[in-house]
From Swiss-Prot:
It is found in: Cytoplasm, Nucleoid. HAMAP family: DNA_YbaB_EbfC. The lineage of its organism: Bacteria, Pseudomonadati, Pseudomonadota, Gammaproteobacteria, Oceanospirillales. Its main location: cytoplasm. It comes from the Bacteria. Keywords: Cytoplasm, DNA-binding. PANTHER family: NUCLEOID-ASSOCIATED PROTEIN YBAB (PTHR33449:SF1). This is Nucleoid-associated protein HCH_02614. Belongs to the YbaB/EbfC family. It comes from Hahella chejuensis (strain KCTC 2396).
């Protein structure tokens, strides 16, 4: 009887691990957009934090270099926060009911 329960437990653990790996792949490929300056600068970033695209409104090309740099940094930071929130939300949904703390880093 115990062997059967252990086998079921192992199957369940393997299934959870497969689901987590799939979720991590989906998160890595998910893209978010961060912006600053009311949309004058937009950054597209994937779940690996790779910046895929930077859009700068032409009106900013007339501004001082420091303003442009500040807006770029703000847009990147906005995108990073959105990636992290997306990752946290997805993992919270995956681990709901398992008794795993929401910020627990999985080893796989």
């Amino acid at each position: 009887m115990i062997k059967g329960n252990m086998g079921d437990l192992m199957k369940q653990a393997q299934k959870i691990q497969e689901q987590m790996q799939k979720a991590q792949e989906e998160l890595a490929n998910a893209e978010v957009s961060g912006e600053s300056g009311g949309g004058l600068i937009k950054i597209v970033m994937n779940g690996r934090h790779d910046v895929k695209k930077v859009e700068i409104d032409a009106s900013l090309m007339q501004e001082e270099k420091e303003i442009l740099e500040d807006l770029l940094a703000a847009a990147v930071n906005d995108a990073v926060r959105k990636v992290e929130k997306n990752n946290q939300d997805k993992m919270s949904n995956m681990t709901a009911g398992l008794g795993i703390p929401p910020n627990f880093k999985m080893p796989f």
